[in-house]
Amino acid sequence: MIRRLEYYGSPILRKKSSPIAEITDEIRNLVSDMCDTMEAHRGVGLAAPQVGKNVSLFVMCVDRETEDGELIFSESPRVFINPVLSDPSETPIIGKEGCLSIPGLRGEVFRPQKITVTAMDLNGKIFTEHLEGFTARIIMHETDHLNGVLYIDLMEEPKDPKKFKASLEKIKRRYNTHLSKEELVS
């Protein structure tokens, strides 16, 4: 089932997600719905807060990146429950990022080239992976969502900050019609 996305201005995008203690049918259904939602919106990753759930979980459809930068997509989306990042490489690189919760905008963000992630899969098995390049960037971006951080908090100053801010306000008003003005946050 495709779920409604939460957009910039929704308070859940600014909250730290709760760890998942047990993999229940509710969590399995959430993962299935998140995969459907990510695919419907043509995303490469999606965190639970982006579909209104404050739990530490994200899905991703990229398996890895080749040496020449080609993305290898997974047969089925990959699940990361309670992810923990470690061992970031020292030299950051800049790359463009976008977000399904901030449609139409992109920004340049410095992130480590390499990262290690330890998480649990949908079967409850703990795994550790060493990732680099765009795949590592996706992992860091989605993990940021679980901590209430958006890429716009980390990005380099946009070329036209006033126009960028106006675009954010437009997203806040256009996509959050289910929220009252008092509920909206930046």
From Swiss-Prot:
Enzyme active site: 142
Molecular function in Gene Ontology: metal ion binding; peptide deformylase activity
Cofactor(s) the record lists: Fe(2+)
Lineage: Bacteria, Pseudomonadati, Chlamydiota, Chlamydiia, Chlamydiales
CDD domains: Pep_deformylase (cd00487)
Keyword field: Hydrolase, Iron, Metal-binding, Protein biosynthesis
Reaction(s) the record says it catalyses: N-terminal N-formyl-L-methionyl-[peptide] + H2O = N-terminal L-methionyl-[peptide] + formate
Keyword Hydrolase annotated: yes
Residues at which Fe cation binds: 99, 141, 145
A biological process from GO: translation
Function: Removes the formyl group from the N-terminal Met of newly synthesized proteins. Requires at least a dipeptide for an efficient rate of reaction. N-terminal L-methionine is a prerequisite for activity but the enzyme has broad specificity at other positions.
Record protein name field: Peptide deformylase
EC code(s) of this entry: 3.5.1.88
Family statement: Belongs to the polypeptide deformylase family.
Entries under InterPro entries matching the protein: Peptide_deformylase (IPR023635), Peptide_deformylase_sf (IPR036821)
Bound cofactor: record note: Binds 1 Fe(2+) ion.
Top-level lineage group: Bacteria
UniProt xrefs under Gene3D superfamilies: Peptide deformylase (3.90.45.10)
